[in-house]
Structure formats: structure tokens, C-alpha cells
Amino acid sequence: MTTFSPREIVSELDRYIIGQHEAKRAVAIALRNRWRRQQLDPSLRDEVMPKNILMIGPTGVGKTEISRRLAKLAGAPFIKVEATKFTEVGYVGRDVEQIIRDLVEVGIGLVREKKRAEVQAKAHVSAEERVLDALVGTTASPATRENFRKKLRDGELDDKEIDIEVADTGSGMGGFEIPGMPGANIGVLNLSEMFGKAMGGRTKKVRTTVKASYTDLIRDESDKLIDNEVIQREAVRSTENDGIVFLDEIDKIAARDGGMGAGVSREGVQRDLLPLVEGTTVSTKYGPVKTDHILFIASGAFHVSKPSDLLPELQGRLPIRVELRPLNKEDFRRILTETEASLIRQYRALMETESLSLDFTEDAIDALADVAVHLNSSVENIGARRLQTVMERVLDDISYNAPDRSGTAITIDAAYVREHVGDLAQNTDLSRFIL
């Protein structure tokens, strides 16, 4: 789990997301509170409940991006799901308890990687022995093995092809849910897993180079050294205490007019979410998981519905409200130039693969921001995503002809931008006026 201070978390988010300081502060405090709770006396620790967050803001202002970056920072089981993917219990589709089962799977993966790192040195030694077995056979004399070991460590045999046997994790046969049995999705039944256990762990033969074989062999040997029961126990504990669920598109399941039909199912999803957010026990194939201390961050654009359209009980379980403001011209400028992987940096790097140098003047960046703001105000406000439309239109000709212009330098100024997006800016969606 991360030990970053709220200020450090916000500064990390600032590298990728422009503005929205209030939302960043809220998630930074919530993340830090996870760590603070772990430092408390056990008797008080159980009483401290997470303060769930509701982020409200138009599309394209950074709600989902905050969740993506937070997942990398959290160092804890984290899952992002769309509320629209779930249906009420009794309907065909996934029920909301699947969120927690998926979160436990994320926790299992995190703990397994941590345990593998702890035994990597031992696993590397065993992997080297297996590579030597593949190179010289198990009956070779000690002198021959040592001779090949030296060559192996010097990298002389890196490109030599060998046949190795590794555990077959078996992605061939997928999983399936038993229809008509709500309790049966205690985890999707995985056929490969069942057959693997029945046959005492299957292996498969792989032909690969010596250098590439180490990845599979080290993973294989690491898994032999770690105890799966310990991993499962730790993963469940980590999920219960540090787990974070990011619920996107929650506005899409808000009842708008109280109408029947599909609306019943939408409200049903909200009702199913209530116990999950409040705290319940979910059955998973790794055992029961309590959701009392899992942090829920919900977000939605609320273009058509309002936060007050959510069930009052669900509103009460999302006590912290954060509003993300729409983006202005200055924000667009900063998105184009200041973020870690800004669009301009991305396009420059893409063109450099064709030996083409791309340069944007300051007035070109101003013009790009202007066009994006104008289109958002006149057509539909889709936030920062509008910049991708504008950039693609501006660079369409350059991208198409790049292989023929290899070795040249191109400077893009405001005149070039206006020339290539002029029709885009004036041609607001006329189709809406055509009968």
C-alpha cells in the first residue's frame, strides 16, 4: 500500500491531469486515510469507515483519468468498473457482487507478484539449472556443466534455441457461469483450473531462446516456492482493508423520471449496490470477503440526471461530493504542453519514427486550444477529448505523406491550423437541421 502524503499524491496526479485540484485533494486524502487507519489500535481500526466519494463533472474533464492514475499509485487492490455493466439480481447479466470477486483476483495478482519478488534469487538459481539441463542434458559431467554455466553467464548462449517444459496455465478453456443459479457465480468455474488440479498440474513443451526462457522458468520456479494458501489469505485481507472500487458512469443508473421498463432494472442495480457500499459479506472462491472497509469512488457526468436522482440511501453512502469544472482555453493549452504524455509530445514521437521533425509554434498551440473551445461550445462539450479530433484533422495530411517526407522538418503555426480545421470549426453539425 502506498505511503505517499496527500501532497505527493496530488503532485503525481498533476503530471497527467490539468486542474481539478479539489477532486485530486479528495482522492489523495481518501488514499492517505487508508494508511492512517492501518496505524490505529485494532479495536478502533474496525470502527473507522472509509468516506466514499462522488465525483460530478462533464465528460472529458479528467474523472476517469484520475482513476487510472490512482490505480498505479494505490499499491493496493484497485478495480475500475462501469455501473452500466451490471444488472439487478434475477436479470440476465452480471450482478454487482462480481465487482468484489474481480477485486479479490486483482489482490491475488498483487500478492503473488510480491511473493515472487521475495523468492526470485532462489528461483533464478533453479532456472539456471533447468537451462543447463536443456543445453547439455542431465547426464553431462560436472566439468561440462561448469563450462556451459560460464558461457551461459557470459551471455554467449543467449540466442541458442532450447526446449523447456513449463507449467501450462491453460488459457485454452475459458470459464463459464452456471445459469439459473445465483449462488453459483462464487467465481466463474474455470475448466482449465479443475483439469489442472485433477491431473496434478499439467506442463507443456516450449521452444525458445536461452535468454527468453528465463522469464517463464523463473516464474515457474517461483510458483513452486510460494504457498498458494498464504497468498489467498493475504489477498483477502488486503482486499478487505485496502481495496478501492472506482464506479464509473453511475449517473447512467440514476432513475430520471420514475418510468417503468428498463428503469426498474437500473434502480435495482442501485439497490444491489447499497449493501455492498455499506458493508456486507460476499462469497468468493477464496472465501468470504467483507466490504465494510473497501473505499468506493463513484463518478458520473450527470448531464441528463442529477445526483439527487440516485436513491437517497445511496447518496447517504457517498458523503464526499466533488465537482469537476469544465475546461477553458488555458486548460487546453496546458493539456497540450505540460502533461507528461501530452498530445504534442505523442505526435512528435510518432513522426520521429518516420525521421520527420515536427515543431509547434506558440500561436499554433493557441489556435488548437481556440478551435477545441469553439467546437465544445457550439457542437457538444466533450472536454479534453475534443483535442484528439482537432489534432488528427491538423496532422492528417502530414501523417499520410510522412514516409515520402523523411528527413524533413515541419513547423506548424496558427495559419496552418486554421487552414486545416477551418471547415471543422464552421461546419457545426448541420445534419441535426435536416429533416
Swiss-Prot record:
NCBIfam families cross-referenced by the UniProt entry: hslU (TIGR00390), PRK05201.1 (NF003544)
Subunit structure: A double ring-shaped homohexamer of HslV is capped on each side by a ring-shaped HslU homohexamer. The assembly of the HslU/HslV complex is dependent on binding of ATP.
Organism (species): Rhizobium etli (strain CIAT 652)
Protein name as it appears in the record: ATP-dependent protease ATPase subunit HslU
Function of the protein: ATPase subunit of a proteasome-like degradation complex; this subunit has chaperone activity. The binding of ATP and its subsequent hydrolysis by HslU are essential for unfolding of protein substrates subsequently hydrolyzed by HslV. HslU recognizes the N-terminal part of its protein substrates and unfolds these before they are guided to HslV for hydrolysis.
Alphabetically ordered keywords of this record: ATP-binding, Chaperone, Cytoplasm, Nucleotide-binding, Stress response
Binding positions (ATP): I18, G60, V61, G62, K63, T64, E65, D248, E313, R385
One GO cellular component term noted in the UniProt record for this chain: HslUV protease complex
